[in-house]
Amino acid sequence: EVIPVRSFNYRQFAVADYHRDHPEQPIIGTEMGSTVTTRGIYEKDTVRGYVPDQDITAPWWASTAETWWTLAATNDFWLGGFVWTGMDYRGEPTPYQWPNINSHFGIMDMCGFPKNIYYYYQSWWTDKDVLHISPHWNFREKGPGWNKPVGDSIDVWVNTNADNVELFLNGKSKGKKDMSRNSHLKWTVNYEPGTLEAVAYKKGKKLTKKIQTTGLPVEVVVTPYKTTILADGKDATVLNLTVLDREGREVPDADNMIQFEMEGPGEIIGVGNGDPSSHEPDKCPEGAWQRRLFNGKCQVIIQAGTKPGMIKFNAKATGLWNGGTDIQTISPESVAAINIDK
């Protein structure tokens, strides 16, 4: 009773008994979650060390996101909690060891690409309209994430803070469901290529979300976080790379090897793709930078040099149209002068 607030690291199953014995003492989750997921993977794979990208797997001492957050959100004696972790990190490979090189605990992967539990938390921690469907809807005979013959049953998850959702597969309704707060919705449907669409209503406002079976990749796309950085030898920008099919749709299961080239006053200082079992180097010899897409995504970090100018970045893959972007580096002195003028 000396402690004004009791903290729990996991062990959410013990909270009810503790609260019964200490009904006036507030509780905070100082370390919660440790849900394990692999971005873009929808079948357990013990050989490659992947777990499904759904809120269903946790070590015995931890919990799913929905389990701990529902407990915290629905009890007044809970002050909230801290999630382990925001992002995957090197070490602590759980629940597998080799060939894993990092954890699966993150709401996002090592590159900051969201996993599906990102949208669960976003649904209940923000006022933003959220409507998210998973899994993706691609079938490949040999894909990195998921193999399903036509007709096989698939659990389709929808994360949302809308009041209700109706799910359609190729225009045919699979049923309408009401959304319980702090939860998610799930339909079991038989796979067929095409379009999955969720139609939701939130306080009378209509929300829609579609995912489609894509074609094969034809084009590399580069999306920079910043297109202007300081020429101070320290500032950097992150470039996210994806590939599109002929209809301009992002291909979520692509695994193309992407090569990177750049010229100008800066350098590539690292690459990644969020794959917890990738043994590719994060740093490459000059002129040999490359990274394979992991479930459709990879990343490059460019750091500025000390001279102002234009960095020209190019990304290419065999058989695909190149992608690229320009990054302007500007002197810190010019920025300081602008700030003084203001």
Predicted regions and their residues:
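Edge beta-strands of extracellular beta-sandwich domains
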Residues: 204-216, 321-332
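Extended substrate-binding grooves/exosites of carbohydrate-active enzymes
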Residues: 1-179, 186-205
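Low-complexity, Pro/Ser/Thr- and charge-rich linker/hinge segments at domain boundaries
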Residues: 211-234, 333-342
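Short, hydrophobic beta-strand segments
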Residues: 186-191, 285-306
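Beta-strand-rich structural segments
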Residues: 154-159, 199, 234-252, 258, ...
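Extracellular Ig-like/FN3 beta-sandwich strand-entry sites
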Residues: 191-195, 236, 308-310
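Short aromatic-acidic-glycine turn motif
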Residues: 218-221, 261-280, 333-339
